Regions:
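Conserved interdomain linker/interface between the two RecA-like ATPase lobes of SF2 helicase motors
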Residues: 180, 187-189, 194-340, 391
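Conserved Walker B
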Residues: 141, 162-164, 414, 423, ...
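Helicase-associated low-complexity/disordered flanking segments
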Residues: 1-56, 60-64, 90-91, 245-249, ...
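Conserved segment of the helicase C-terminal RecA-like domain
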Residues: 187, 429, 433-443, 448-489
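Gly-rich Lys/Arg/Thr-decorated short loops/hinges at beta-loop-alpha junctions or inter-strand turns
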Residues: 32-38, 154-161, 290-295, 381-391, ...
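Conserved P-loop/Walker A NTP-binding site and adjacent catalytic elements of P-loop NTPases
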Residues: 44-230, 324-328, 335-349, 353
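Conserved C-terminal RecA-like helicase domain
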Residues: 93-95, 103, 110-119, 278-296, ...
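Non-catalytic terminal extensions of ATP-dependent helicases
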Residues: 2-6, 286-294, 300, 309, ...
Length: 863
């Protein structure tokens, strides 16, 4: 694997020798005869150097990892992989982390190759699945690999778009499963953001897949300028100021703009005057009493006026910086911003554009949703904002509405999209400017600052290739803002990629279904998670060797003629540890009886007496050089403790993933999903039972809990509506986190739904205890918060009536319902279910899936 950084421009041919010029000529001739050249010839633009090199490497038979900024043109390499597959009459799969990206790429490829040659697989959508080119989510490909699908037979190229998504806690592990399990005949094309440890990632791919070419480009095709927008007060117009000072050529340099800093100082003074606050008199020590700097008596600093959202949009429109994306880290904030712009009377569209917007919206909505659903989703309000040139874009919207926004923005009809950060993930919506409202966001537990990677992902949308000469990234002045923070975020364009891989129960049985126990452990040792752990373990290994050498030196220094001084120091260390920690540990230990507690303290006291006696009677205590030896002995003891600490860390890293797998196998064996076998030579193997075969077909965050509930007859007394309602707890994730209860249990608290829910909770708690006992992370708790909502929906209720009185958005409901329908369908097809009544339950699950997957949920647009 080699790293190549690229910039435009070729070496000066006049500096080459005749032989070098001839070699260069031959290389050009060979390239002209290549598939890469045939692919590039009809393109309306010249390929960048990094694109050419990546394409050449792919054609030569290498795996390729391309790391480049947003908008640099990474997808050209993916397009060439598909072109190459078509030319060689083999299959290519294009995988994405989210369904919205899959849907977008599917339409792009259909435009090029036609609907007969392109398929789409996203779990709830299947179009032309046996096509030569199939776009899919990564989970679908993972499932195909485990099922050994015949669709994989002619597969030779897999594009992993947004491969840095591998770091995602919930879905990232699937990427590693795919990279590890793909047949070696398949070449991988990975498209990644510019992460700081991309060489490590590429080296790992090479260790698993073979020859891998890493191609890096840090060149942005459209330069990006950084700005800050401020506003003195609500009566004045906002001002857009450069974050960095400009050089003699008018380009932004790397030093902060003094004009910006001075202007912020002026606004600080104005805010202080407005609040009637005077500057602290340092000579009088104001605010520096016993409380120190910022003592309690200090009046809070007056805050500068925060620019109004509508005023920001109005100013950017005046400056010709639209179309733009305004990032606000709150769904409600996005919707409020659009409403504020409308209420302020802003209009960004012409009469001709309004006509086009109405036509496109009517075309996209026609036949998709009922008038009742549209009313529940406040469609008329959504449409009016579009006609004015504004739109929200966030996960709380249904897929159809987001697709309408994306289409209108791409066609230049919607001029300002107000979005949460989810829009920054891959969706092709470049803009002239990007506005970031704050440099911090709420992460579910508290407000945290943006990382350089997150900031780059957001601002990378600014600057449309072939349209704009400059892109603009604008930070809105806000509470606590200082220019240095924005500068730190914008100057660090890369961030590290870390694995989130961990074995799961479903993964374990799928591995053991296709390989023996030891092979499965070796496979897990190939994960990027273990690669990273090994990298840090190697550093610890060096530290361990250094400590061991130091200890050997100390042992020579305190060598004693009277006895074993190392043994003497070990006695003293043990005695010190027990005297300091022994009683404290026993005080916090739980005993069944007072007698047990008393006996434990008696044993501790006896052990202390024994150690004191052994230390006092040790022959080294009579050595005349005892104090000199103790000087070295104390150093030896300190380094011995450090060696133990480092060794523990080393042991926890080496083979850590395989050890998690062992723990999972222990749990599954105890529950009857696996059978353990050991031959005469001590070799261990694991085989799947009937229960294990069921678990193998359940892909869910709650895979084991669901199987245990099925096998325990938890759902036997439910009808289709009740089954859908109870199982919603395994797919619903409340936005505020934590588990919750429904407003009511259909049938009452003593009815079958409430009883089944209680049983399911108990099963989940039991599995949590098992995981904790085996040192594994606890499972996510089931959340019954929308059980009543999903029951009403399965019973035929309208979207409006189901959501009435809840704070759930249409988009959240649809997404949860789609996931529920997927789980129900998995149960329906997991034949034969290995328990009495299994056939009936499978039929019930199929009926429930049909009841859930209707109306707005069944809309073919992916979510």
């Amino acid at each position: 694997m080699a790293r190549h950084q690229h910039h435009k421009g070729n070496a000066d041919s006049q500096t080459l020798s005749p032989s070098q010029r001839y070699a260069s000529f031959q290389k050009v001739q060979r390239h002209r005869a290549s598939a890469a050249a045939r692919f590039a010839e009809p393109l309306p633009f010249e390929l960048d150097d990094f694109q050419t090199e990546a394409n050449d490497a792919l054609e030569a038979g290498s795996n390729v990892l391309v790391a480049a900024p947003t908008g640099a043109g990474k997808t050209v390499v993916a397009d060439f992989a598909i072109y190459l597959a078509q030319e060689r009459n083999v299959k290519a799969f294009y995988t994405t982390p989210i369904k919205a990206l899959s849907n977008q790429k599917y339409h792009d490829l259909v435009d090029v190759y036609g609907p007969d040659k392109v398929g789409l697989l996203t779990g709830d959508t299947s179009i032309n699945s046996e096509a030569d080119i199939v776009v899919m989510t990564t989970e679908v490909l993972r499932n195909m690999l485990y099922e050994r699908s015949t669709t994989l037979n002619a597969l030779r190229y897999v594009i992993l778009d947004e491969v840095h998504y591998l770091a995602d806690r919930f879905r990232g592990p699937v990427w590693e499963e795919v990279i590890i399990h793909l047949p070696k005949t398949v070449k991988i094309v990975g498209l990644s953001a510019t992460v700081s440890n991309v060489e490590d990632f590429s080296n790992w791919i090479a260790s698993v897949r073979g020859d891998t070419k890493l191609v890096i480009s840090e060149h942005r095709p459209v330069p990006l300028e950084q700005h800050v927008i401020v506003q003195a007060d609500e009566y004045t117009e906002p001002e857009v100021l450069d974050l960095y000072r400009r050089d003699g050529n008018g380009e932004q340099a790397t030093k902060l703009n003094a004009e910006l800093i001075n202007r912020l100082d002026q606004l600080d003074r104005k805010a202080a005057r407005r609040r009637g606050e005077e500057r602290p008199d340092k000579r009088k020590g104001f605010g520096r009493g016993r409380g120190g700097k910022g003592a309690k008596g200090h009046a809070p600093k007056a805050e500068r006026h925060t620019p109004r959202r509508w005023a920001v949009v109005d100013e950017l429109n005046f400056l010709g910086m639209l179309p733009g994306i305004y990032f606000i880290f709150s769904r409600n904030g996005c919707d409020q911003a659009v409403e504020q712009c409308i209420n302020a009377g802003l209009e960004l569209t012409t009469d001709e554009e309004v006509t086009k917007i109405r036509r496109i919206v009517d075309e996209m909505v026609e036949g998709q949703l009922t008038q009742e659903d549209l009313k529940a989703l406040q469609f008329s309000k959504f449409r009016f904002a579009l006609e004015e040139g504004f739109a929200s874009h966030h996960a709380g919207m249904i897929a159809l509405f987001r697709q309408i926004v994306e289409r209108l923005f791409e066609e230049g009809l919607v001029k300002m999209v107000v979005a949460t950060e989810t829009l920054a993930l891959g969706i092709n919506m470049p803009a002239r400017c990007v506005v970031v409202e704050k440099l911090e966001k709420f992460d579910g537990t508290g407000h945290v600052g943006l990382t350089p990677g997150e900031f780059t992902q957001l601002t990378g949308r600014a600057g449309r290739r072939g349209i704009d000469t400059i892109g603009h990234a604008i930070v809105v002045d806000h509470h606590g803002f200082v220019p240095a923070t924005a500068a730190a975020l914008s100057s660090k364009r890369v961030y590290p990629l870390h694995s989130s891989f961990r074995p799961t129960f479903n993964m374990a049985v799928n591995l053991l279904n296709s390989s023996d126990y030891e092979t499965a452990r070796v496979t897990l040792d190939q994960s990027f998670a273990q690669w990273e752990a090994n990298e840090s373990a190697w550093q610890l290994e060096s530290q361990i060797n250094t400590l061991k050498n130091a200890l050997a030196g100390y042992e020579q220094a305190f060598a004693c003629e009277h006895g074993d001084f190392k043994q003497f120091m070990t006695l003293r260390m043990e005695l010190s540890d027990i005297e300091k920690e022994g009683r404290r540990k026993l005080k916090h230990e739980v005993f069944l009886t007072d007698q047990e507690r008393s006996r434990a303290f008696q044993n501790l006291d006896q052990r202390i007496r024994d150690l004191r006696k052994a230390e006092h009677e040790h022959p080294c205590r009579n050595c005349p050089d005892l104090q000199q030896h103790l000087k070295w002995g104390h150093r030896w003891a300190r380094e011995t403790r450090e060696l133990q600490r480092v060794t523990d860390r080393y042991d926890s890293r080496t083979g850590s993933v395989a050890r998690q797998f062992d723990c999972i196998c222990d749990i599954l064996t105890g529950l009857g999903y696996l059978e353990r076998h050991e031959d005469a030579a001590g070799h261990i193997d694991m085989t799947l039972t009937e229960k294990g075969s069921l678990l193998r077909r359940i892909y869910s965050e709650h895979d084991l809990e669901l199987c245990e509930a099925l096998l325990a007859g938890t759902f036997d007394k439910l009808d289709a509506n009740g089954l859908a309602a109870v199982l919603s707890s395994l797919v619903y994730e409340a936005r505020r986190g934590g588990d919750s209860e429904p407003r009511h249990y259909p049938g009452g608290i003593s009815g079958p739904i409430a009883i089944a829910s209680s049983k399911l909770k108990g099963i989940c708690e039991d599995i949590d205890i098992l995981c904790e006992d085996h040192g594994l992370d606890e499972m996510q708790r089931p959340d019954f918060g929308i059980l009543d909502v999903m029951y009403e929906w399965a019973d035929g209720g309208s979207l409006g009536s189901c959501l009435y009185g809840t704070d759930m958005t249409g988009g959240d409901f649809v997404r949860t319902a789609k996931r529920l329908a997927d789980v129900l369908q998995q149960i329906a097809v997991a034949q034969p279910l290995p328990f009495d009544g299994g056939e009936r339950l499978a039929g019930l699950a199929h009926e429930a899936a049909d009841r859930v997957n209707r109306g707005v949920v069944a809309y073919s647009g992916v979510d």
